[in-house]
């Protein structure tokens, strides 16, 4: 799947993206996750979508040449799982949403901003890269701990979390 043989049928449905993106994440291939999401979901946005569709916007599977049958399908929402975990780097460290790791992977991006819903409220993270410096702003509800952890995409960079330099 990560290195498909020539002639292999490509993923044709957003339903399979969950498994594909999961495999990429396990292999530490965050940049490819972002590329796959952009490749397969950007065409929906280009058509004015505000939800995720049942099928990718390739070809004409619906009537009147419109590229889908249904405009809202939970099975198509894999990016909602992976973007906070990979690009924002927010992952749980303790049961009940009481502690989270913040370890954003840059994935070839210059900035990212978002939040992860938790039982106590949102964990929000934004980051911006400027040259060799990465500024991360993170916040969590009262009683929720955040722990920063470096990853390979941050190696050699001057990282600041909420204005404090990180080693």
Please state what every model-predicted region is.
Residues 12-26, 75-85:
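Well-ordered alpha-helical segments within folded domains of soluble proteins
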Residues 31-167:
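Non-catalytic C-terminal accessory modules of carbohydrate-active enzymes
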Residues 1-17, 63-75:
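Solvent-exposed loop and edge beta-strand segments that line ligand/cofactor-binding
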């Amino acid at each position: 799947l990560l290195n498909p043989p020539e002639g292999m049928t490509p993923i044709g449905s957003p339903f399979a993206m969950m498994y594909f993106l999961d495999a990429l994440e396990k292999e530490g291939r965050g940049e490819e996750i972002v590329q796959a999401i952009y490749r397969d979901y950007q065409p929906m946005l280009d058509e004015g979508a505000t939800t995720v569709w049942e099928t990718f916007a390739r070809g004409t599977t619906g009537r009147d040449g419109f590229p889908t049958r249904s405009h809202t399908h939970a099975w198509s929402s894999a990016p909602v799982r992976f973007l906070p975990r990979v690009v924002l780097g927010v992952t749980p460290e303790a049961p009940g949403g009481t502690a989270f790791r913040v370890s954003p992977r840059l994935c070839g991006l210059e900035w990212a901003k978002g939040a992860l819903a938790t039982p106590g409220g949102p964990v929000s993270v934004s980051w911006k890269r400027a040259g060799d410096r990465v500024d991360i702003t993170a916040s969590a509800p009262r009683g929720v701990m955040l722990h920063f952890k470096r990853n390979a995409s941050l190696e050699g960079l001057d990282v600041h979390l909420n204005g404090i330099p990180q080693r």
